């Protein structure tokens, strides 16, 4: 899930929005401030997931609102435990919301909150919706954003059978299973 200049390792939308940034033994904390700054503008809760032995390398790079999940290696398997719970973030940046939503999603938010979609041409629609979304109270906007994101279908298993070169097209067009099956069939047919 892309958020401004950062890509969230794991984004969860299940009643609330959570971002998880995973750091391994090989990572350094030098980009973490920027990533967390981006994530807190959109997600209600943000966590970093780090190896237990790296805790003191990272703890000074994050604020007290960011949760910490530690990876502990025990007898050839990994255990996760919550060192610090994330504090819920009541703010949400409307500009960040707009950058993450598809056209139909931001139109749905405007329609749900205001009762109508602006009667403007396609060239003006984004800017007008952005302006209207920026006037929605943060608590309402968080709920509406979450509702729209949760509507997205999780088709990762289905996309595993799609060739890499076509996967992005399927994602951006929000194709359903039937359409993807037809596309795969057509791609496998001889040209002549």
Named regions from a protein language model:
Residues 1-12:
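N-terminal, Lys/Arg-enriched amphipathic/low-complexity engagement segments
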Residues 6, 16, 32-35:
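Generic hydrophobic, aliphatic-rich segments that mediate packing or membrane embedding
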Residues 10-26:
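Conserved catalytic cores of phosphodiester-cleaving nucleases, focusing on short active-site segments
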Residues 13-15, 72-76:
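Short acidic-glycine loop/turn motifs at beta-strand connectors
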Residues 26-72:
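Catalytic cores of nucleic-acid endonucleases
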Residues 77-152:
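A conserved mid-domain beta-alpha-beta active-site/ligand-binding segment of alpha/beta enzyme cores
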Residues 128-192:
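C-terminal, charge/polar-rich interaction regions
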């Amino acid at each position: 899930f892309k958020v401004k200049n950062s890509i969230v390792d794991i984004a969860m939308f299940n009643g609330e929005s959570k971002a998880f940034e995973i750091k391994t033994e090989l990572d350094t904390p030098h980009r973490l401030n920027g990533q967390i700054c981006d994530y807190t503008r959109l997600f209600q809760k943000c966590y970093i997931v780090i190896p237990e032995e790296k805790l003191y390398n990272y703890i000074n790079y994050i604020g007290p609102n960011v949760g910490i999940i530690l990876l502990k290696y025990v007898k050839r398997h990994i255990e996760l435990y919550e060192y610090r719970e994330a504090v819920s973030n009541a703010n949400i940046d409307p500009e960040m919301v707009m950058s993450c939503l598809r056209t139909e999603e931001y139109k749905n938010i405007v329609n749900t909150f205001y009762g109508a979609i602006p009667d403007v041409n396609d060239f003006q629609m984004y800017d007008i919706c952005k302006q209207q979304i920026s006037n929605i109270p943060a608590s309402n906007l968080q709920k509406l954003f979450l509702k729209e994101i949760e509507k997205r279908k999780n088709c990762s298993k289905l996309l595993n059978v799609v060739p890499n070169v076509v996967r992005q097209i399927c994602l951006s067009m929000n194709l359903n299973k039937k359409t993807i099956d037809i596309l795969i069939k057509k791609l496998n047919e001889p040209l002549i």
